[in-house]
């Protein structure tokens, strides 16, 4: 038989193999912005491997256009919010968060909680729009999906998985205070050495820092139980027709894929159904556009600085823009600044403004000396991967924590956006560029990031395919999910043992008293005789 016919027969056999069930059907509960960027990377790889991916998105979704061609199937459900209204809400809340005064703990975190509640109200509205859409639910039911994939910071996917009786995989960066991870996933975060996310603490805490960390833990737990849990518990109970809780339904997730890594996160215990996939977007740099490459090359030995505060920040105040531009004009490096606004008056000849930059490709360029970042996790992972020291100017959410982690690792200098001066920014840049320790530290993190037996993306895809092949991963799910809080902490056992000890002590005391009574009675009787 010729090689040609052998190849054709082999291809036919492979096609039969793939069509006979090796490829699965994935239902995705969509998220927005950076949450979607990471999810999309996983989904595109699943499609490359022959899986069918259906993304469930609202008609208000900012990132989805059903008219655009894509390998992903987009199932749009109607909602009363418009795209413009939804985008305005998000931008307003993020602006509010980034401008919150940090003078007092209670004021700062109470307002953060209000912001999270606002997003929670939108999430529950979208979820109601889906489950009340009988036509859509019937269509999804008949599609016979093999797994649901979602970011739990936007709840609802677990309800769909429960209704359709299919496995659930989460992909998550974090939730405020780790409340979902702890109360729903059973994660272990001992407050004695694991700082709460958004606390900006390290794992080397003083006594007062541990007190502060414990206050954070209690605060987030209280707010979660007070509001988030109750509204979702009630809604899920109504839909399922039985009493249930968000913790119970979320706790049924088969696998939790956490977008973190040990060169970024502080060490803490992990459960068997949890894996780290931090650095999904990290990849070798591609060639730059011609004009940009020429500008980078013109920097000579001084190199370039890459500057971006992310896609969420627009219309920077003129005063802040001029402070930054003035600082950048003081350094010998050329600067590529992602900036969407009016050109600052103090902009130097060494700085070019771009509405968009190929961030990963610039960070991977050999002439890049430093990265000025808002502290988004994706950007930090790319900087780590390419070994670029950072100047962090965090704005909101986990960004202060991320920069604090890099500062602890000796890979970044942190500044405050609202109070920094031109001199502060210029000195910070000179420090990370000229002090070799920053480069050495970030290169160490880079070597750790690259030295993995399996790439984060391949691990993520493996676990999703694993769940599809085995119809779940319940063998990895800890029995802790089936225990009440007092059983989990063995309070019933401790109470029983204390009762036993108390009973034994009581019996011994009674025996001693009886013997003493007998002895004294016998003594009195002897005297009377």
UniProtKB/Swiss-Prot annotation:
It catalyses: glucuronate acceptor + UDP-alpha-D-glucuronate = acceptor beta-D-glucuronoside + UDP + H(+). Glycans are attached at residues 67-68. It comes from the Eukaryota. Residues 1-24 form the signal peptide. It is found in: Microsome membrane; Endoplasmic reticulum membrane. Keywords: Endoplasmic reticulum, Glycoprotein, Glycosyltransferase, Membrane, Microsome, Signal, Transferase, Transmembrane, Transmembrane helix. Its EC number is 2.4.1.17. Gene3D superfamilies: Glycogen Phosphorylase B. The keyword DNA-binding does not apply. SUPFAM superfamilies: UDP-Glycosyltransferase/glycogen phosphorylase. UDPGTs are of major importance in the conjugation and subsequent elimination of potentially toxic xenobiotics and endogenous compounds. This isozyme has glucuronidating capacity on estriol and does not catalyze the glucuronidation of beta-estradiol. Capable of conjugating 4-hydroxyestrone, androsterone, diclofenac, and hyodeoxycholic acid. Belongs to the UDP-glycosyltransferase family. This is UDP-glucuronosyltransferase 2B33. It comes from Macaca mulatta.
